[in-house]
Amino acid sequence: VKEKSVRVCVGIFCLFLLTPAMPLRRVASAPSPETYKQDAQGLEKQFEPFLKAFQKGDDKGMDESFGVFRLPKPKEWFGNYFSVEDAAKLSSVYDREITDAESSLIEDMNRADPGSRFRVRCEPRGESGAGQDSSGGYGLRPVKPIAVEQFRLEFRSGSHDQKFSFIANFVYVDGAYRFVGGGGAAFWAKPEAGR
């Protein structure tokens, strides 16, 4: 009996040595969000799901796909760049800013060519002082510089060649451009931001 148990132990030991190591099982995690290049083509690609949803008249799809332009953690992001008081103000109005931007874009597309397939062309205007207070002291001033990238966005319909364009400001955070205001400056640098 003792000899049999020794053989079994030796057999198990040999089996252990000859068996290749089993790969460790990976824990399933949430898929990572898509990342986009930090250039005009990356921004154009970022708009594609939204433009497809618009063509289909898919309101839910438009809302979901426009979400990529939102700061992932606005309170934390504003807290990194502004005083505590200003960060609280900005994070409380940011949702309205992004919702208004989406609504305005949809209105412009409907005016230009409702239900059409649009393409966007993004022309960089460079990194500028668009994120700094350029309003004569009425806006909110960041405590450290913010790399705001400004683009001229031209939307052109595929069916009737209708087009419109505007200037928009973005920050590049976590692999995507995040909208921070239209026109010549980020929303916090405009006079109404401090009110």
Could you say what each language-model-derived stretch is?
Residues 24-59, 71, 75-76:
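Short, low-complexity N-terminal intrinsically disordered segments enriched in polar/charged residues
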Residues 1-6:
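N-terminal secretory signal peptides that target proteins for export/translocation
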Residues 141, 152-154, 160-191:
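Short beta-strand edge/turn micro-motifs at domain boundaries
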Residues 9-20:
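Bacterial N-terminal signal peptides
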Residues 59-85:
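Short, well-ordered alpha-helical segments enriched in acidic and aromatic residues
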Residues 193-195:
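Short acidic DE-rich linear segments
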Residues 78-163:
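Surface-exposed, charged secondary-structure patches
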Residues 47-57, 62-65, 171-172, 177-179:
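Conserved catalytic-core segments centered on acid/base and nucleophilic motifs
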